[in-house]
Amino acid sequence: MKWFDKTVSQRQEDVLRLLKKYPDKIPIYITGQNITLNKFLLPYDITQAQLMYTLREKIALSPTESIFLFFGKRREMMPSNMMIREIYDKLKEEDDMLYAVYSKENTFG
């Protein structure tokens, strides 16, 4: 069953099960163009910049492309030096998952 086909309570149960098994991880669901794997468990002590670096590698961006991450329902941009744990605590959804959308832009040429 796809993630968004589940009810909020089913998604929350799944997330709570993951958090119990991996208490030092942050569950995040990332959407955007050219991404095949959407759900990630991230270390709580990485910054948004480190996540963006990992994401760049996963989607194989060219050196001329920039990536932008938007978090939560309101699609907020956060400082790149902000810890993922802080973003999670501030913007996690009712199912305890942090949602993000990335956008890429040809900015360097």
What are the residue ranges of the model-derived segments?
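Ubiquitin system architectures
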Residues: 1-109
